[in-house]
Amino acid sequence: AGCIAPGKTGHSRGKLDVRAVRGPLTLKELRKRFNVSPVPFGDPALLMSQMYVLPANQAIHEYGLIPHWIDAGLAVIERMKTLGVKIIDIRQPTQSLILELASVKKVLSSSLHGLILSDALGLPNARVRLSSNVIGGDFKFSDYCLSVGREHSSTPLDDKSTISKLNQIKFNDHIRWDADLILSSAPWNHE
């Protein structure tokens, strides 16, 4: 749905049938290399809101942390566990993931799709940086934030972070996007 970094479109040549993109930065990159017309913005993972609803009154943890897979083995993960933060692996089966997300009040994530899924399900969330290992840096996060009208910010966490630091993080709890616009751009609506 989007470029990972400037100049990284995932395609080197050929014709692309682009119906929607993650955000304006991706569209700009695609327009540099391909003859791509303006299309709607929105990551398809936001459509999870059309398929799943979080079970009500299940939150038993103040915070959940969704680390990017590349951050999964870091010492900061163990530190977060000692602070009572629920560690959530986004790679698990969808139904299990939804139940784990229902068990938290707020989501911290170094994974873009952790933020997107949290937004789709209406969970307050914030981007955290656990390392500099996530490919693409801020690009894909900025692209997404621009597409849903939210401020892009991130908070670095490490193995010395405290609950006080977590309590000071500003969480995003509202985005602007149009599911119908994304759905109407799907190929089956244009055959």
Mark where each language-model region is.
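Active-site anion-handling motifs in enzyme catalytic cores
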Residues: 1-191
